[in-house]
Amino acid sequence: MAQEQTKRGGGGDDEDDFASSTAAGQERREKLAEDTDDLLDEIDDVLEENAEDFVRAYVQKGGQ
């Protein structure tokens, strides 16, 4: 039978690392959400200005 090894960390350093990585992760998520919103706003602007051209570009010809 295979033996399992258990590694146990001691001290509170892990909690500090976890808290800082969680804060950094939250900051990154907020930045990505902001960038995504900006991109979607830009797409909306293009569609408002050129909706007809946009649709024509994606209409398949020949009934395909």
Curated annotation (Swiss-Prot):
What processing steps or modifications follow its translation? Answer: Is modified by deamidation of its C-terminal glutamine to glutamate by the deamidase Dop, a prerequisite to the subsequent pupylation process.
Q: Which pathway does this polypeptide act in? A: Protein degradation; proteasomal Pup-dependent pathway
Q: Which UniProt keywords apply?
A: Coiled coil, Isopeptide bond, Ubl conjugation pathway
Q: Isoglutamyl lysine isopeptide (Gln-Lys) (interchain with K-? in acceptor proteins) cross-link located where?
A: Q64
Q: Name one GO molecular function term.
A: proteasome binding
Please list where the region (Disordered) is annotated: 1-37
Q: Which parts of the sequence carry Deamidated glutamine?
A: Q64
What note about domains is in the entry? The N-terminal unstructured half of Pup provides a signal required to initiate unfolding and degradation by the proteasome but is not needed for pupylation, while the C-terminal helical half of Pup interacts with ARC to target proteins to the proteasome.
Q: How does it assemble?
A: Strongly interacts with the proteasome-associated ATPase ARC through a hydrophobic interface; the interacting region of Pup lies in its C-terminal half. There is one Pup binding site per ARC hexamer ring.
Q: What is this protein called?
A: Prokaryotic ubiquitin-like protein Pup
According to its UniProt entry, this protein's organism is Mycolicibacterium paratuberculosis (strain ATCC BAA-968 / K-10)
